[in-house]
Amino acid sequence: MSRNPFMQNMPEIQAAGGLVPMVIEQSARGERAYDIYSRLLKERVIFLVGQVEDYMANLICAQLLFLEAENPDKDIHLYINSPGGSVTAGMAIYDTMQFIKADVSTTCIGQACSMGAFLLAGGAKGKRFCLPNSRVMIHQPLGGFQGQASDIEIHAKEILFIRERLNELLAHHTGQSLETIERDTNRDNFMSAPRAVEYGIVDAVHEKRQMPV
C-alpha cells in the first residue's frame, strides 16, 4: 500500500472519523493502493484545506518542492478551501510558490478567506480560478498579543509591518492600487466568484473543466 509521506493531517478528515478514500490501480505488476491525496499528487494536485498553520505549511512546501524536482516545467495545481490562519505559515507557502520554477495554478473551492485569499491571488497570472459558488474574503491581519507594555508595542509595530507588506503584495497580484487595498481590507470584505475576478484576485470562474488537471 502506497502512503503519501506529505499527506496533510487535516482536522476535518479526523473529525469525520479519519477515513481517507483509497484508490486501487491495476498494472502489469499487480494491484496498488493509494490514498486519494497520494494519487492526486501523482497528477500534480495539492490540497490546502482548513486552517493555515505551520504543520500544513511545511507539508505543502515539501509537496511543491517535490513536484518541481520531478518536472520544473509542468504546472502544479493548488486547490484551496480555507478560512485563513497563520500569516507566517501562509508566507512560507507563498514564498515557496514564487520560488519554484513551475507555475502554480490556484483554484478556490468552497472558500478562500484571509491568508487563503492571499495564496489564491498569489498563483501564476492567468492560472487563478474560482468555482462558481465559492467565496473569497480579504481583511487586515488580526492581532491579540498580551504581555508587558513594551512587548505589546513591539508586536504592534510588527503587525503593522505585516499589514503593509501583505497589502503591497496583494496590490501587486490584483492590479489594484495600494490605497484601494488598504481601504478594502480595513474590514472583512467578502466577494462572490465573479467579484473576485473583477477585483483581480482570480482570472476566471470555472464551471466545467476544459482540460485535465
Curated annotation (Swiss-Prot):
Q: Subunit structure of this entry?
A: Fourteen ClpP subunits assemble into 2 heptameric rings which stack back to back to give a disk-like structure with a central cavity, resembling the structure of eukaryotic proteasomes.
What family is this?
Answer: Belongs to the peptidase S14 family.
- At the top level, the lineage of the source is Bacteria
Q: Which PROSITE patterns match?
A: CLP_PROTEASE_HIS (PS00382), CLP_PROTEASE_SER (PS00381)
InterPro entries xref list? ClpP, ClpP/crotonase-like_dom_sf, ClpP/TepA, ClpP_His_AS, ClpP_Ser_AS
Its annotated compartments are:
Cytoplasm
What cellular component terms from Gene Ontology apply here?
cytoplasm; endopeptidase Clp complex
Question: Which chemical reaction does it catalyze?
Answer: Hydrolysis of proteins to small peptides in the presence of ATP and magnesium. alpha-casein is the usual test substrate. In the absence of ATP, only oligopeptides shorter than five residues are hydrolyzed (such as succinyl-Leu-Tyr-|-NHMec, and Leu-Tyr-Leu-|-Tyr-Trp, in which cleavage of the -Tyr-|-Leu- and -Tyr-|-Trp bonds also occurs)
Question: Which terms does the UniProt entry file under GO BP?
Answer: protein quality control for misfolded or incompletely synthesized proteins
Positions annotated as active site in the UniProt record? 114 (nucleophile), 139
* Gene3D superfamilies found in the cross-reference section: 2-enoyl-CoA Hydratase, Chain A, domain 1 (3.90.226.10)
Q: Briefly, what is this protein's role?
A: Cleaves peptides in various proteins in a process that requires ATP hydrolysis. Has a chymotrypsin-like activity. Plays a major role in the degradation of misfolded proteins.
Q: Note whether Nucleotide-binding occurs among the keywords.
A: no
Task: Supply the Pfam families for this chain.
Answer: CLP_protease
Q: What class of enzyme is it?
A: hydrolase
Q: What is this protein called?
A: ATP-dependent Clp protease proteolytic subunit
Name the Enzyme Commission number(s) assigned to this protein: 3.4.21.92
MF GO annotations: ATP-dependent peptidase activity; ATPase binding; serine-type endopeptidase activity
Q: Which UniProt keywords apply?
A: Cytoplasm, Hydrolase, Protease, Serine protease
